[in-house]
Every structure is written in structure tokens, then in C-alpha cells.
Amino acid sequence: MKKLKHSILSLLLLMGACIVSCSNDDGQTSSTDPDEVGGESFTIPVSSLRLRDPFILVDKKTSMYYLHFNNNLKIRVYKSKDLSTWKDEGYSFIAKTDFWGQQDFWAPDVYEYEGRYYLFATFSNAGVKRGTSILVSDSPKGPFTPLVNKAITPSGWMCLDG
């Protein structure tokens, strides 16, 4: 029960930090108090996160939390063991030049299904305003690739969240 309360409190703090920050920077921060797990340093405190449209995947296979968020026309991922300190894992998705969506990267959600990871996100281009795409990876941190190179929602629909 204590662990559940701690997780809920940490999640609330994370969401509060995300709402307050809403910045356009790259999300990079640093700390002088690293938390080491299995040789990895989790040095980014939740209170310093500056990001938009976060989604947290609880991955039972790796016993980690994965935080995906949009970041300057890319999707970035952090991971944590406790929701309090985080490690920057880089980008989970960087669109190639032939990817249909070239603007408005928005609200990624990630789910595990039958051993693979699926990222749902909203993108736009000149002909499709806010269409949803599904991306797939064998890892919760990516890299994700498009299942199909087009929006899965009708072009007349405005889909705000993947």
C-alpha cells in the first residue's frame, strides 16, 4: 500500500511539473545527486522536468517506467525505476524525410501488445491536420517506425491525441 501511495504521489508531482513547465526546450536537465541502478545513473529529478504531453508506460518486462513526450518535431523518452529520478534515453522517434507527418507532433501514447510496443501519436502535414499514426518497436524506448506511412484516421477528422 505504501508503494502504491508513493507511486501515485510521484505521478501527481510529475504531472504538476509538466503542467507548470510547458516549455519548448529540449528537456535536458542535470542533478548533483545521481541515483544508480544496475550501473545506470538516474540523475534527472522529477521536479526539473520541462516537457509537454507526457505519457508514462509501466513496463513489467524491464520493471521500469518510460516517459514519452513530444520534443521539437521528435518524440523523446526518459526512463525511471521510481518516478522520482529519470534518465534521458534520447529520441524514441525521429521522422525520416519521407514520413507523412512533418509538423505538429503531439501527445504520444505507448502500449505493449504481444511482446511489441505501439506508439500512437498525432501529426500533421499540408493535407492532413492532426491525423493519428501508429508506430511500432521491439523496445519500450524505441526506435519506433511507422506501421504504415499515413494517418490511420480519416483526413477530415482532427485528432488531438494519438
PLM segments and residue spans:
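Bacterial Sec-dependent N-terminal signal peptides
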Residues: 1-33
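Carbohydrate-active catalytic/glycan-binding domains of CAZyme proteins
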Residues: 22-162
